[in-house]
Structure formats: C-alpha cells, structure tokens
Amino acid sequence: MAVYASNGITSVAASLARLMGFSPPHGADEPNLVLERYARAALGDRPVQRALLYHPDGIAHYLFARHTDVFLPVLQAAPLALPVQSVYPPVTPVCFASMYTGLPPEGHGICSYAKPILRVDTLFDAALRAGVRPAIVSTSGSTLSKIFLDRPMDYYILDSVDEVNARAEQLLREDEHDLLLVYNGNYDAAMHRYAPESPEALRALRVIPPPRACGRPRRAGRPQPLPRGSRPRRAGGSASAALLLPGAGRRRRGPRPRTAR
C-alpha cells in the first residue's frame, strides 16, 4: 500500500491533547511528532491555552494540488502545513470519529456513513476531565452535530454556514471556551450536488463570508444550562467571518459548560 503521509488522522486527538497539556483519550494513537516538536520549539514548555479546529468538509488533497491559489491566504497565515492520511472508508463520520477518538474505525465503531453517538472515550471527554472547556459549532444534521452529543459541554447547532461562522466569532470574542470546533459544509454540499470541480463547487471553495463586528451579546440572549446529557437546541446567529486562530493566554476557569438554546 502506498504511504502518502507519515501520520494519519488518528494522531489528531493525542496531538491536540498533548499540546494543551492534558492526557489523550484512552487508547488514542500516538501524536504527530512533527507538530509537537514545532510547538515545543515555539512555545517551550507552555501549553496551548486556546485552540480553534476549523473543518471545511469535503476538501480533498487533490484540490489543494490543482487549485493551490485558493489556499494561499491560509498558507501565508499558517506557520506549519502537514499532510495526514485518512482512514477507510474516507467518509465524514468515520473520519471525524477517528480524528477525535484517536482510534481506527473498528476501534470506535463507526465503519460506514452513519452518525450514532460515540460511546468510546473522545478528545472532549479527556478535555472535560482536565477542566478544559470544549464547544462544537456546526450546522444541523452534520456529523459534528450528532456523534459527539451527550457530553456536558456546549453545542451550537445552527441552520447555515454564515450563522455558524458568526457564532464562532462571537464565541472567540467572549473567550469562555478553551477548545472550539467549527464545521463548514458549504463546499461539501456543492460538491455532492454538482461535481467536485464544478463551477458551483469551486465558488463554494472560494467563499469567505464578509467580516462584520460581533459585539458581546446581551445577557438576556445568553444560553442557559441544561442537565447533563440533554440535547442541544438550535442557536441563532448572523453572517460573519470565520477565524482560524490558535490562541494563547491564561486559561480561565468559569462555570460549567452550557448548551445553547
């Protein structure tokens, strides 16, 4: 079998946990040593205090090779770019489950295009044990809106990519979470409907929502706590820009996580 990258996506969970200073999920694959060494050279022994994981779905490596100009703004902003190898089958639920458990499909149990709630240990469980506050911001019906439910953390489930990006920027400004996952499915939807390199899909690949100020919301609009294991309701939002920025700073300890209404 050809090897396209020295690390697989199962390295993501342990890599992020190690960088943020907590123990990886039980049984997770080894971290990406290149990423870890780079971070240690940049940060020394200091852990990463804030992390944003941005997931634009369906963007395969061949798109990067054929349409590199689209990715130039990311390459100019990102200090390190690493290829990682997928699992099989390379469909969204299987991949996200492998990324955030650190396990192969047979280990976490999602082996096809299905979206059950994972019952094995995940990055989010490991983060919560360490007092790290995670949140997921995603469109309704997506893999990220389903397979990691039933944890005492925040879920912001919205109707559109613009709303997702607006809420993500708002959450970054509020700075009440340590680990934020953001999902955009606009390219994936266009690719499946038309074709991977159709004009419609390539337009979606290039779309960046216009920036807009997102002030701190009024307290009356803030989400209220729900009991452990409760399902999220949809949260409101408006169009804004997505941000891709790993943060640093002193970790604040706040109240128990909330689930958005």
Stretches found by the model and what they are:
Residues 1-261:
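Feature captures the catalytic ectodomains and active-site-proximal regions of enzymes
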